[in-house]
Amino acid sequence: MKTKTLLRYAISICAGLGISGMVHAQDWKVTGEFGWFGVGKAHEVEKGHFYWVGEFSGTFFNDKGEGSLFHRAGVKCPAWFDADFNNKKSKAGGYCIITDLGGDQAYLTWQNAGSPEAGGRGPGTFQYTGGTGKYKGIGGNGTFVGVTQVNWQDGTSTGYSTWNR
């Protein structure tokens, strides 16, 4: 009798933890905008085709505003960008480190493909890979659309990406 009671209790706890884990995973889904500035080195592979390696960095603004997940957090993304203007195709990928005002960090990997022209859109996906502090154990994935507004003559770029919109 005591064994059955303990077994039921253990099953209840496991079920409760499973449900709360699912709810918590949903909490990591942010909706907002990341304004970025890209600095790096562009190499012309062939006329009209560039391969860029560098970093996109800026600030994330959560649509829910003050007190919401990652709102006004710093974002730094070491990355690569393959821009083929001849065929009007681009692809990119890398990692991002998201740091909030308290210094806690979340890490993710991302990839996208699209158009390299100014205003060109590149839909993609990201996956959380880990974190520190309150983001320890972060998991899940999301979608984003990266938009390059300007490819500057000095090899830098400016743009933004919308997350989960």
Show which residues each predicted segment covers:
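Bacterial N-terminal signal peptides
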Residues: 10-20
